Amino acid sequence: MSTADVLVVGAGVAGLAAALAARDAGARVTVLDAHAGASALAGGAWDVASDPAASPEDVFRPTRTLREALLTRARDDVHHPYAKLGAGLVEAVRASHARVLAALAIYRPLDLDGHGVLLATDLGLPRRAATAQHAILDLGESPHDGIWVGVFPGPRQGESHFVAASLADLAAHAGDSRRFEALPITPAAHASDTLPHPHERAASADTDAGLARLLDALGASLGGRREGALLVPAMLGVTRDDVAARLRAHLGIAVGEVVAPLAGPQGLRLVRRIDTALREAGCARRSARVRAIEPRSSGTTVTLEDGETLRGKAVILATGKHTSGGLVVRGGELVEPLAGLPVVVDGRVLLLASSSAGRDTAALFGTSPFRASPASRAGVATDDAHLALDRDGRPRAPDLYACGALL
């Protein structure tokens, strides 16, 4: 049996937030995770009230602050977890992000009275986010400058040309004064630099020799330019956090990465910093897969794959949604697999399909990549204390909580 007061299932950003809050309250915390989840696939930025339908004009020249976007989301979607926080929404988001971002130590602080960070994605699209890793370039810091997009020889070099052309076109369409132009980068000759991938360049930048070669290559390619900014692929280190700052100090211009939304150096940095933050907070870690969670009126039991059972004063599900397995499709049904909690969409329990063939997954996930599907809004319902609810809207157990994307 566990000696922890709190068992957190999942070690992504939500699991970190839950663990830190419990530790700050004086609890003994054990975090259970068997593998990297969705956070490992995350890019180097996240939002608090994103608008995927925002036009380039809205992105380059936003009119709403993050605070206003938060309040609008809570007002317009009464089933969103934000709506449960009522008048305390803004302060709750501010305080929780301040704690988590400080613990991670590689992200910009959250400014709810601002417009967030203006980023470029590796798909050549401008995006606003609430915060981003320091290694990522904030285009908002160069409102009237030329921005060079570094093109490195090797696999995927054509993508950088596309990013430069796409950003230039979208900025012009939005009437923005920033100018984007591709800049070929010629790395210093080195045997191990033969057509490396961006993640290999990122690992190379972790070494003093690799960073020195990168400094030389960028300096030579810039040719003494001290105006504007330099946008590069996600390659500014994995295990060290000062690469971007060193480049900026040496070159005299802003240098930063595009946001890469799939697995890569930015996700690896986040996972590394989560591990460090949990350790520094005094949380115990168990690399163990949870087989089942049994909610009872007398308390919740967690059973590991090896048969060991754990109990605590509280169990917090921070298992994510579809990508990390917090919700799965079984027999055509969308289910929460560990505790058997009902799945809710827009405040209503997702009823079981009556057909023996199960549910049409297209009805759950949709057929258009540009529209939110019911499954994207699906999750576990909680009460105002974040206790997970059963099909009748009552707490499933007195000590079983849920948080994060699982909601």
Residue ranges and their predicted role:
Residues 2-4, 306-314, 396:
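Core beta-strand elements of the Rossmann-like FAD/NAD(P) dinucleotide-binding domain
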Residues 48-152, 163-169:
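Dinucleotide-binding Rossmann-like beta1-alpha1 core, especially the glycine-rich loop
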